[in-house]
């Protein structure tokens, strides 16, 4: 009986320690992160596919909110959504942010573009307060295909301006910059509605994040995470 009790306690302690050692990855974003238009976001979204790639030593949280803007005066500010509160409470060791697509809306960018950098820095600071040791990765925007109804009326140009702002933010905030644009750009068919990736497209995003986190670029170079003295675990 004592042996059984000891074994049960030992297994419980091992389970707790194992859970404590999992690297938490918070995926922050809009409908592209959430998995909108996908058959089953719970398994098909890029954060879900990322979980499969990283394995059990990581815990990936999907905190995507459909329609969310980065701009705090936008039509649906991310920092005012429940998903933001949950992401902060999650206190990820790694925070992956992909926001800005919805800010190309004519209600938003033309009126509040001057606040974009300030608002993005505030978002980054919020996650650093929640976990001062977190590593933050921000993504260049996914493409918007030229068949989008507002593509030529402003979306194309505003999308480009936001890309430039994101690159500036990465340098100023000292965070890792990751590219969600180039991997999808040659394949517009992966964006059936001109904005949201299909399952294959979401898989490409998952692999892009996986490479940014683990440094597995097919032997080309290591992720910036290694410069932060962070020990990463492979599943």
Give the role of each language-model region.
Residues 54, 130-132, 172-173:
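Helix C-cap/helix->beta junction micro-motif
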Residues 115-118, 122-129, 161-168:
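Alpha-helical scaffolding segments of alpha/beta enzyme cores, especially the outer helices
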Residues 22-27, 32-121, 157:
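Conserved SGNH/GDSL esterase-like catalytic core that processes O-acyl groups on lipids
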Residues 225-227:
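Surface-exposed, proline-enriched loop/turn segments that connect beta strands in immunoglobulin-like
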Residues 1-21:
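Bacterial Sec-dependent N-terminal signal peptides
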Residues 21, 38, 141-218:
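Catalytic His-Asp segment of secreted/periplasmic serine-dependent ester chemistry enzymes
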Residues 98-104, 125-160:
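Active-site segments of SGNH/GDSL-like serine hydrolases
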Residues 229-235:
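Short, solvent-exposed loop/linker segments at the N-terminal edge
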């Amino acid at each position: 009986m004592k042996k059984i009790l000891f074994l049960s306690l030992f297994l419980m302690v091992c389970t707790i320690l194992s859970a404590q050692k999992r690297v938490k990855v918070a995926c922050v974003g809009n409908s592209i992160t959430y998995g909108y238009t996908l058959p089953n976001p719970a398994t098909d979204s890029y954060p879900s596919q990322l979980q499969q790639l990283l394995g059990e030593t990581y815990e990936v949280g999907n905190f995507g909110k459909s329609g969310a803007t980065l701009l705090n005066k936008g039509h649906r500010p991310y920092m005012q959504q429940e998903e933001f509160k949950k992401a902060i409470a999650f206190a990820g060791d790694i925070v992956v942010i992909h926001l800005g697509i919805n800010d190309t809306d004519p209600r938003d960018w033309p009126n509040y573009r001057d606040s974009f950098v300030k608002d993005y820095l505030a978002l980054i600071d919020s996650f650093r307060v929640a976990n001062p040791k977190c590593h933050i990765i921000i993504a260049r925007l996914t493409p918007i295909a030229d068949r989008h109804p507002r593509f030529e009326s402003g979306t194309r140009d505003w999308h480009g301006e936001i890309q430039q702002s994101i690159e500036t933010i990465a340098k100023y905030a000292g965070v890792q910059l990751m590219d969600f644009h180039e991997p999808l750009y040659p394949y517009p068919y992966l964006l059936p509605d001109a904005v949201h990736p299909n399952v294959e497209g979401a898989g490409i995003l998952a692999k892009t994040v996986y490479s940014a986190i683990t440094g597995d670029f097919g032997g080309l170079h290591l992720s910036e995470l290694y410069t932060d003295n962070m020990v990463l675990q492979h599943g």
